[in-house]
């Protein structure tokens, strides 16, 4: 029977180091996070960094070739981020919900676009 006062079940070991989203574009890569709020901040993104943002639109497209992977809070398999990442062969995890809260510039992560997960390897 449901007990509203029962303690929440313990999370699996390491669960706090995994961010789940939707598979946007297949591929696995490890790299350093660059959290960006606007394409106007795009000059901060260094080649090979993991682009983390809330969502993307056509204004973000010039940044994608520099990114090793893309992670967004909002979106699905037909979102701008997913489509552009697939076209360029860049792994993407979209629709994570809280990636921009949990990830900071300098964090080291592993992005698995095929499984839709981001593993936090080392926090900055």
Regions found by a protein language model. Give the residues of each.
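Non-catalytic, soluble scaffold/interaction modules
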Residues: 1-124
């Amino acid at each position: 029977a449901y007990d509203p006062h029962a303690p929440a079940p313990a999370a699996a070991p390491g669960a706090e180091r995994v961010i789940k989203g939707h598979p946007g574009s297949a591929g696995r890569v490890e790299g350093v996070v660059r959290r960006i709020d606007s394409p106007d901040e795009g000059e901060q993104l260094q080649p090979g960094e993991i682009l983390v943002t809330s969502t993307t639109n056509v204004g973000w497209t010039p940044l994608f070739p520099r990114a090793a992977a893309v992670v967004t809070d909002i979106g699905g398999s037909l979102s701008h981020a997913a489509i552009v990442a697939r076209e360029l062969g860049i792994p993407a995890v979209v629709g994570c919900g809280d990636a921009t809260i949990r990830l900071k510039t300098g964090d080291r992560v592993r992005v698995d676009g095929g499984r839709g997960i981001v593993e936090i390897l080392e926090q900055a």
